[in-house]
């Protein structure tokens, strides 16, 4: 995919960065080289982590078009809002419910979701604002979306790495 979309030849990247790695380099230098290599993917969802540091490709977020302003949100919400399990919610003018979900990284508890939706059930409309959401756990996003349909629906496929080989992945499920 990366080769088709971006012209990235991962084998060439591997060869180029392998030349920079030596047996006597420090842990910090090795981490820096590997971080640079992983950043070639230009993917904000790929990180290199250790007990001492985390490297991430921030440009995807920093260069993302800004379509969200905390100050505008504070004008609409004022101080009359509730935070519950990663959700910020309130009832706006004209009896419109508003839920802001800034991340799917943390789980949303069923009880918290029940409380949020029960409070907003009296509303004439509902806005679910996921602008500036950095992503996270697909299960969390599915849990929120499932509250708005009675039908089971396919939302995507997942594959898992199953071995050290280049193409060692599970079947899409």
Segment roles from a protein language model:
Residues 1-173:
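Flexible, low-complexity junctional segments that flank or bridge functional domains
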């Amino acid at each position: 995919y990366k080769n088709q979309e971006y012209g990235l030849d991962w084998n060439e990247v591997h060869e180029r960065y392998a030349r920079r790695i030596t047996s006597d380099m420090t842990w910090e230098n090795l981490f820096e080289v590997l971080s640079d290599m992983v950043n070639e993917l230009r993917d904000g969802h790929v990180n290199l982590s250790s007990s001492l540091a985390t490297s991430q490709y921030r440009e995807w977020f920093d260069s993302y078009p800004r379509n969200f302003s905390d100050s505008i949100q504070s004008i609409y919400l004022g101080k009359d809002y509730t935070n519950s399990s990663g959700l910020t919610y309130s009832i706006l003018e004209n009896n419109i419910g508003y839920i802001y979900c800034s991340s799917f990284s943390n789980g949303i508890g069923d009880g918290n979701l029940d409380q949020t939706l029960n409070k907003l059930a009296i509303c004439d409309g509902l806005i679910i604002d996921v602008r500036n959401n950095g992503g996270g756990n697909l299960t969390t996003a599915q849990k929120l979306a499932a509250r708005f349909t009675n039908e089971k629906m396919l939302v995507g496929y997942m594959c898992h790495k199953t071995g050290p080989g280049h193409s060692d992945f599970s079947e899409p499920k």
